[in-house]
Every structure is written in C-alpha cells, then in structure tokens.
C-alpha cells in the first residue's frame, strides 16, 4: 500500500520531519489492518474498481473525473455497482466517468458560500480537519492550493477519498485516518486551516479552537463552520440529550458568543461571513445515501424545530487570523 508515499516528503519540507516519521508507522499497511478489521473488505472493493483513465479532470467549479466516453469496455452499470459499494456517500457531489454521485450533502453550496470570503488559496498549504471524503479538499486544489492534508477518523470516508485518488492520482492531496488529537501540538505550518462541522462535536470547544490555532503559521487563516443558535453574547445552547437525533452534540453558541470564544483564544480579524439555515434541498437522502437525513430529524409539524423541539440547524461560517 503506497497511498502516503508522497505525503511524508511534503510534511518534511514543511519542517515536520518528526511527524512524518510517526505517520510512516501509523499509516503503514500492517498498522491500518490491525486498527480496522474491515480494512480488507474495503481494499477488495477498491481493487475491484476498473482501471480507467480520465480524458478530462475539472476541480474548479465541480469535481468531475472523465466522461462516459472513457468507459470503453467497462459497463456503466458495473462502475455504478463498484461505487455503490462505498455507500453511504455523504459529501459531494462527484461526477465520475459520467456517473453523477448525488451525495447526501450539496457540499458545493457550502463551498460557494465561503469561497468569496476567505484568503485566496493559491499556493497555500491547507489542513482540513474532519474532512469527510475530501470533497472540499478537491475544491481547494481546484482553487490553487499547493498542498491539502485532510484528517478524518471514519474509515469509509477515507476509502471514498481513495476511490477518487484511484483516478485523480494527486500527490498533493491526502486524507489520513486520524483525528485532530493525533496531530502534534503546535505544528504552526499551515497557511489555512478548515474546521467544518466539527466544533459542536467537541466536549471542549475552546480547546479545539486552540488546537486549530496551533496548526496555523503566524498570519494564517482559520475557516470555521459550525452549528449556532440565535441570541446574544451570553447565549450558548447545550442540548440536554440528542440534537437532531445526534448524541454527540455539545455546545451551540450564538454568533456573538463564538466571536468571544475566538477572541479569548487569541484570534484577530474575526468575521462571521455567512449564516444559513440548513434545508432539505441541501441535506437529503438519495440513492447514494439511503439512510435517514435532515427531513427525518426535524419536527414534521414545524420545520423550524428538530424532532426534540430544539432550534433547527443553523450553520455559520467564520474567518479569523492567527496573529
């Protein structure tokens, strides 16, 4: 397994030789097989995908790999079955040799909301925390990022990334199966750090903000997306139990409260650049994600509330700078 051979020199060139050495052990085939009992099945599914060569690649406005004309002797139905083996597809959409992977989330909508407000990514080294299957990382590369490292603890998402890498073969975009807690403290080597859909899952959100800050070089930019609630600086909602059927939701601050958190953590140039109510057009079940989705999490009689009676999901995007 040579997925990460190109990763280690990039990290070493960023002054992270020791981290690169640690990851060579953590990401070795033997270690991954030991950590993940279902890894052999995923590897078999990956190897069963056809060898195809895309006639075109587009990452700027979409994530498009090849066209239907590239399939040659491979049938469209066989490729669909191969891709469906990696269900559920949550982040996207992707177009793969003419097959439209209609994912649960229209992640391209979030990208369009944030892109006009962040520092240009051209030439930047980016860390994407909780990156899922790497969809936004591909969009970052399309926007000119020099190097993108995604960290994602869920193996199915990492394997979906490897599906795309099978055809894109990009040595400057990697998704590795670790969490933020596995990143060495204060590497201070990334120009941009993204954390989207992570903060509300952390028992200690301020510690998470400090971890993100430690990953940035001085002058680097944090792009933070999270669930919020309406209210003033003292408004922070902690669900007494589940939130939208999720067990692991801890703190939902107001815009003003999260601004204060970022200030107390030492960030400057803090701005909330977008706040958008999540709709069932942006997050929904599809043939590529056949489990429950947003419509099942909301009060059927009041779309402004979750089924538990809490405020329905409202997501904000913040930018902030490490001085």
From Swiss-Prot:
NCBIfam families reported for this sequence: PRK15068.1, tRNA 5-methoxyuridine(34)/uridine 5-oxyacetic acid(34) synthase CmoB
CDD domains noted in UniProt: AdoMet_MTases
Alphabetical UniProt keywords: Transferase, tRNA processing
InterPro entries registered for this protein in UniProt: CmoB, Mo5U34_MeTrfas-like, SAM-dependent_MTases_sf
Example of a GO biological process term: tRNA wobble uridine modification
Function, as annotated: Catalyzes carboxymethyl transfer from carboxy-S-adenosyl-L-methionine (Cx-SAM) to 5-hydroxyuridine (ho5U) to form 5-carboxymethoxyuridine (cmo5U) at position 34 in tRNAs.
Residue numbers binding carboxy-S-adenosyl-L-methionine: 91, 105, 110, 130, 180-181, 196, 200, 315
Record family assignment: Belongs to the class I-like SAM-binding methyltransferase superfamily. CmoB family.
Protein name as annotated: tRNA U34 carboxymethyltransferase
Subunit structure of this chain's protein: Homotetramer.
Organism the protein comes from: Geobacter metallireducens (strain ATCC 53774 / DSM 7210 / GS-15)
GO molecular function: methyltransferase activity; transferase activity, transferring alkyl or aryl (other than methyl) groups
Reactions listed under catalytic activity: carboxy-S-adenosyl-L-methionine + 5-hydroxyuridine(34) in tRNA = 5-carboxymethoxyuridine(34) in tRNA + S-adenosyl-L-homocysteine + H(+)
Gene3D superfamilies per the UniProt record, alphabetical: Vaccinia Virus protein VP39 (3.40.50.150)
Enzyme Commission (EC) number: 2.5.1.-
Enzyme class: transferase
Short name of any one Pfam family annotated for the protein: Methyltransf_9
């Amino acid at each position: 397994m040579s997925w990460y051979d190109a990763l280690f020199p990039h990290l070493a060139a960023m002054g992270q030789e020791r981290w690169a050495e640690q990851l060579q052990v953590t990401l070795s085939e033997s270690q991954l097989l030991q950590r993940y009992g279902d890894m052999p099945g995923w590897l078999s599914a990956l190897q069963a995908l056809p060898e195809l060569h895309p006639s075109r690649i587009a990452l700027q406005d979409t994530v498009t790999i090849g066209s239907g004309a590239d399939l040659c002797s491979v049938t469209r139905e066989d490729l669909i079955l191969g891709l469906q083996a990696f269900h559920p597809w949550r982040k996207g959409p992707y177009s793969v040799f003419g097959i439209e992977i209609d994912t649960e989330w229209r992640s391209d909508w979030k990208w369009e909301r944030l892109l006009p407000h962040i520092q240009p990514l051209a030439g930047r080294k980016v860390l994407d925390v909780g990156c899922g299957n790497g969809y936004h990382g591909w969009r970052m590369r399309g926007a000119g990022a020099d190097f993108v490292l995604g960290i994602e603890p869920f193996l199915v998402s990492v394997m979906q990334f490897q599906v795309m890498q099978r055809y894109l073969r990009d040595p400057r975009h990697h998704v590795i199966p670790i969490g933020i807690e596995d990143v060495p403290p204060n590497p201070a080597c990334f120009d941009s750090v993204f954390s989207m859909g992570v903060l509300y899952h952390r028992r200690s959100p301020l510690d998470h903000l400090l971890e993100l800050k430690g990953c940035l070089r001085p002058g680097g930019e944090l792009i933070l997306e999270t669930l919020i609630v309406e209210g003033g600086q003292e408004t922070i909602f902690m669900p007494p139990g589940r939130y939208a059927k999720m067990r692991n939701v801890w703190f939902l601050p107001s815009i003003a409260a999260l601004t204060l958190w970022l200030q107390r953590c030492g960030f400057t140039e803090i701005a909330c650049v977008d706040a958008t109510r999540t709709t069932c057009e942006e997050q929904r079940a599809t043939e590529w994600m056949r489990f429950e989705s947003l419509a099942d999490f909301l009060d059927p009689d009041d779309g402004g509330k979750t089924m538990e009676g809490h405020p329905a999901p409202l997501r904000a995007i913040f930018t902030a700078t490490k001085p």
